[in-house]
A protein has these predicted regions:
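Compact structured core domains
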Residues: 1-3, 9-14, 19-22, 34
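Short alpha-helical segment immediately N-terminal to, or the first helix within
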Residues: 15-19, 66-70, 80
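Residue at a beta-strand N-cap/secondary-structure junction
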Residues: 23, 71-72
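Intrinsically disordered, low-complexity acidic/proline-/asparagine-rich linker or regulatory tail/stalk regions
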Residues: 111-124
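Basic/polar phosphate-binding segments, predominantly the helix-turn-helix DNA-binding elements
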Residues: 17, 23-59, 78-107
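N-terminal positioning helix adjacent to the helix-turn-helix/winged-helix DNA-binding module
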Residues: 4-12, 48, 57-60
Length: 124
C-alpha cells in the first residue's frame, strides 16, 4: 500500500538530494525505490504532497539560492544545480521564489553590504 512505502519514499528523497545536479529520470528513481513508477509517484505524492519531479526542482532551487547567496552567477548556479539551460533555470527559479535569480542575488549582495557598513562592536 501507499502508506507502507515511507522507507522507499525517504530513500528516493535521499537519492534526489545526493544526485540533484545531474539528469534524474522517474525510471531511475523507481529502480532506487524498488517500486513501479506509478506506485512511486502515488506514494511520494501522498507522503510529501508533491511529485518526485517537483521535489527534485525544489531541491535544485534551494541549492541554487544558496549558491546565489554566495555570489555565484546565475549561469553558474544553473549548471551546478542540474538545469539544462539558464532560461529553464530562470523560469523555475522565478516560479518557485517569486524572484529572478539575478534579483535574488542582488538582495543578498545588498544585505551583505549593509552588514559590512555597520561599525564593529569590539567590546571584548
Amino acid at each position: 500500500t501507499v502508506s507502507a512505502c515511507r522507507v522507499e519514499v525517504e530513500r528516493t528523497c535521499a537519492f534526489i538530494r545526493s544526485h540533484y545536479a545531474r539528469h534524474i529520470t522517474l525510471e531511475e528513481l523507481s529502480l532506487q525505490a524498488g517500486l513501479s513508477k506509478s506506485a512511486l509517484v502515488r506514494a511520494f505524492a501522498k507522503a510529501k504532497g508533491v511529485t518526485p519531479y517537483r521535489y527534485l526542482m525544489a531541491v535544485r532551487i534551494s541549492e541554487a539560492r544558496r549558491l546565489l547567496e554566495r555570489g555565484v552567477s546565475s549561469a553558474e548556479a544553473a549548471v551546478e544545480t542540474g538545469f539544462s539551460d539558464q532560461s529553464h533555470f530562470t523560469n523555475y527559479f522565478t516560479a518557485f521564489t517569486g524572484l529572478t535569480p539575478g534579483a535574488c542575488r542582488e538582495l543578498f549582495r545588498q544585505e551583505w553590504e549593509m552588514w559590512q557598513s555597520i561599525p564593529s562592536l569590539d567590546v571584548l
